[in-house]
Swiss-Prot record:
Keywords: Ribonucleoprotein, Ribosomal protein, RNA-binding, rRNA-binding. This is Large ribosomal subunit protein uL18. GO terms for molecular function: 5S rRNA binding; structural constituent of ribosome. CDD domains: Ribosomal_L18_L5e. It comes from Klebsiella pneumoniae (strain 342). This is one of the proteins that bind and probably mediate the attachment of the 5S RNA into the large ribosomal subunit, where it forms part of the central protuberance. NCBIfam families: L18_bact. SUPFAM superfamilies: Translational machinery components. Pfam families: Ribosomal_L18p. Disulfide bonds: none annotated.
Amino acid sequence: MDKKSARIRRATRARRKLQELGATRLVVHRTPRHIYAQVIAPNGSEVLVAASTVEKAISEQLKYTGNKDAAAAVGKAVAERALEKGIKDVSFDRSGFQYHGRVQALADAAREAGLQF
């Protein structure tokens, strides 16, 4: 089993549990150059809010889009957009990535901006 398939296996198990609970999910995806965050409806078929370092509004404020500062900016942006839509409580779906570094920075920034998970 390679690294990617192991991550996908971990992510699938967590997603299945969150779907059983019927929770709104804050999903994080990380690449070496960018980080993406989406708030997904409990049924899993609708993206309610999204933010990423690919967006011009976020990437213009940053020197580099693949570090903790960029992740924190995305976390703050996704939390503000979720609160505008009336979404306060979410479940954090780390997509099989280790809760460390950029993933943790995004989560901490989202919590500071007002999301609860």
